[in-house]
Structure formats: structure tokens, C-alpha cells
């Protein structure tokens, strides 16, 4: 392990340690998360998914960051994607049981909110299949587009926001 690996582990410990050592911090986190789900989705995805991408870069290239990788733009994009994922979870977890009732399943909404049973498992599986077939392809396409955009902008947040696509007269598209 290199020095950067110990630093990465140290950052993870600093992020998660307060939740284990302080009941009041953990209680505050749970109440803030319940009251401000979208804000917390942005923060959690922004931090954790970006750390995951950095870990992936470490595995594939041997470093946690490099020129053009764009840690900050990736964190912003992941934060926005996290908000979309949160919205999709809400929409599908509420909408699919309603749709199942519309299609003839009795009490799907009550079942998904009740004790575990095989019908609840069936509803949960249906929610998962619906979300992964309807939402996931759009999500993955958008994520690929944003990754490409970040790389095209050299990983700079300012460049990502002010980037204009090349015009055919620039000669960039004909190469």
C-alpha cells in the first residue's frame, strides 16, 4: 500500500467515524436525512460515488486522481444523479404498487407497507424490474454523456459549465 492509500482510508474513517462515536450526530443525520431527502441525496451521492470513481481509477491506473479526471465536476454530476435516483425510487416505489392494483392485484399498496410475505417480495421485485428497465438505461446514458463531457473539458468545473461544442468549421468534427 502506498501513502495515498493510507490517506484515502483516513478520509473514509473521518467521514464515517462521527456516526459511530456520537449518538447525537447520528440522530441529527437521520432527522436531517428524513427532512431533506433531496439535499442529502446530492451530498451522499456526490461524496460516496465520487470516492468510488476515485477508487476505480486507483485500481485501473494506480492513482486516485489525475489531470483531466475532474473530481469536483464528477461530485457535482453524481450529486445531481443522486437526486434523480432518489426521485426515481420515490416514483417507482409508490407508482408500481398503484399500477399493480390497477392491473388487478388486491391491496398491493398495503402489502408493500406491511409485514414480509411472498406478495411483498413479488411487489418489490416488480418495482426493481420496472425501475431497472425504464429508468436505468436513461440514467446510464446520461451518466456516460456527463463523463465524456467532463473529460472533454479537461476536468475543470469552470470549463464544464462554459463549454461550447465545436462547430464543423473548426475542423474538429472532420478528424
Name each model-derived stretch.
Residues 26-33, 99-102:
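Membrane-interface helix termini and inter-helical loops of multi-pass transporters
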Residues 11-26:
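Alpha-helical transmembrane segments of multi-pass membrane proteins
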Residues 96-121, 157-159:
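Membrane-interface interhelical connector segments
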Residues 61-87:
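Hydrophobic/aromatic-rich structural module bridging two neighboring secondary-structure elements via a short loop
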Residues 82-103, 128-156:
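Transmembrane alpha-helix/helix-exit interface in multi-pass inner-membrane proteins
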Residues 32-49:
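Loop-to-helix transition at the N-terminal end of transmembrane alpha-helices
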Residues 163-170:
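Conserved small/polar residues in nucleotide/adenosyl-binding loops
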Residues 1-11:
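N-terminal membrane topogenic signal
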